[in-house]
Amino acid sequence: MKSACKPHGPPAGARGAPPCAGAAERAVSCAGPGRLESAARRRLAANARERRRMQGLNTAFDRLRRVVPQWGQDKKLSKYETLQMALSYIIALTRILAEAERDWVGLRCEQRGRDHPYLPFPGARLQVDPEPYGQRLFGFQPEPFPMAS
């Protein structure tokens, strides 16, 4: 922040004044007690906001750790490991949903047989999309993540 204060007294290094005295005197006379208190209050408020933000983030990670399977680990997962496990868990659940969807469609086709409106001719089978359900739904290609040990 630039100050609009003008220096008081002789410039630093002038006759009779020590070289560093001017800067210290100018800082006190320019800032004044009101400005210093205001800056300190703003800094305290910013620190409190950052503390609340970090507490909220840590609470969110704790909640995520409770729902993500840890597969036998006794130690608390790091934030990075928690995100990796959450991603793996979401991908696994997406695959389960895709398999369930395929099974359900297959059963419905077998039950309806010839009467199925989506089959072009009797005895035809539904084309199963090789792309996993999650990729169709969310449009992303999952990448394998190395697990930290």
Swiss-Prot record:
Broad class of the protein's primary localization: nucleus
Q: Which GO terms describe its biological process?
A: cell differentiation; circadian rhythm; entrainment of circadian clock; entrainment of circadian clock by photoperiod; neural retina development; optic nerve development; positive regulation of retinal ganglion cell axon guidance; positive regulation of transcription by RNA polymerase II
Q: Which GO terms describe its cellular component?
A: axon; cytosol; nucleoplasm; nucleus; perikaryon
Show the Gene3D superfamilies listed in the entry.
Answer: Helix-loop-helix DNA-binding domain
MF terms (GO), sorted A to Z: protein dimerization activity; transcription cis-regulatory region binding
Matching PROSITE patterns:
BHLH (PS50888)
- Alphabetic keyword roster: Cell projection, Developmental protein, Differentiation, DNA-binding, Neurogenesis, Nucleus, Transcription, Transcription regulation
Q: In which tissues is it expressed?
A: Expressed in retinal ganglion cells. Expressed in the cerebellum, trapezoid body, ventral nucleus of the lateral lamniscus and in areas of the auditory hindbrain such as the cochlear nucleus, lateral superior olive and medial nucleus of the trapezoid body. Expressed in the modiolar nerve root and in the cochlear in a small group of bushy neurons within the acoustic nerve. Expressed weakly in the sensory epithelia of the saccule and utricle.
Q: What happens when the gene is disrupted?
A: Mice are viable and fertile but display multiple optic abnormalities resulting in blindness. Normal hindbrain morphology, however mice show disruption of brainstem auditory signaling and binaural processing. Loss of retinal circadian rhythm photoentrainment, and decreased expression of Opn5. Loss of the retinohypothalamic tract connecting the retina to the suprachiasmatic nuclei. Loss of axon bundles, optic nerves and chiasmata, with a decreased thickness of the retinal inner plexiform layer and inner nuclear layer.
Q: Does the keyword Transferase apply?
A: no
Q: Where in the cell is it found?
A: Nucleus; Perikaryon; Cell projection, Axon
Q: Does the keyword DNA-binding apply?
A: yes
Q: Which CDD domains match?
A: bHLH_TS_ATOH7 (cd19714)
Domain bHLH: start-end pairs: 41-93
Q: What does this protein do?
A: Transcription factor that binds to DNA at the consensus sequence 5'-CAG[GC]TG-3'. Dimerization with TCF3 isoform E47 may be required in certain situations. Binds to gene promoters and enhancer elements, and thereby regulates a transcriptional program of retinal ganglion cell (RGC) determinant genes. Although the exact mechanism is not certain, retinal transcription regulation by ATOH7 has a role in RGC determination and survival, photoreceptor population development, targeting of RGC axons to the optic nerve and development of the retino-hypothalamic tract.
Q: How does it assemble?
A: Forms a heterodimer with TCF3 isoform E47; interaction may be required for DNA-binding in certain situations.
Q: What is this protein called?
A: Transcription factor Atoh7
Q: What is the originating organism of this protein?
A: Mus musculus
Q: Which gene encodes it?
A: Atoh7
